[in-house]
């Protein structure tokens, strides 16, 4: 994920899946994407997919959203460490990130949302935490139209994962 101003973050999967030295990959991120500050973080969910959008999202140039789980959850400590990490890092203006938390007690991927212009599309599950998830986005992003969408979402696969790369099957003929 990126803030659009030269700061990016990803899980350490980026290092695991690319057969080049970490420093070379960091240099490519700067050369091709203009990333001057690159946060590569151990995946706190510790699942098979290790995608950052399953637990975090930059909401703006100053705000980041990190999932929150009950203290009885198996990944509680790792997720809290990740939230603290972001709270201790600085945005482009040298200020600490404003960290918003979104409650996901049953691994709901509310962070796997999609932002398009002034709209935020949030995956919903028909559960008791859906309204709270929408409210978190409304509070974090005043002026945005926050909309919930039900679907066959999974904890590691929701709106952002599915929509960010919709192919045009007729494009290459």
Map each language-model feature to its residues.
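Histidine/cysteine-enriched polar flanking segments
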Residues: 1-173
């Amino acid at each position: 994920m990126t803030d659009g101003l030269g700061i990016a973050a990803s899980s350490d999967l980026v290092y695991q899946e690319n057969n080049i030295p970490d420093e070379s990959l960091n240099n490519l991120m700067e050369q091709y994407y203009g990333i001057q500050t690159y946060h590569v973080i151990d995946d706190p969910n510790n699942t098979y997919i290790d995608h950052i959008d399953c637990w975090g999202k930059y909401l703006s140039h100053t705000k980041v959203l990190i999932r929150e789980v009950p203290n009885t959850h198996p990944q509680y400590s790792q997720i809290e460490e990740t939230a603290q990490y972001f709270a201790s890092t600085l945005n482009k203006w040298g200020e600490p990130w404003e960290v918003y938390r979104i409650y996901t007690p049953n691994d709901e991927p509310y962070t796997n949302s999609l932002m398009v212009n002034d709209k935020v599309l949030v995956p919903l599950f028909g559960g008791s935490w859906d309204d709270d998830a929408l409210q978190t986005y409304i509070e974090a992003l005043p002026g945005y139209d926050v909309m919930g969408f039900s679907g066959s979402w999974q904890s590691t696969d929701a709106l952002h994962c599915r929509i960010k790369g919709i192919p045009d099957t007729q494009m290459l003929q």
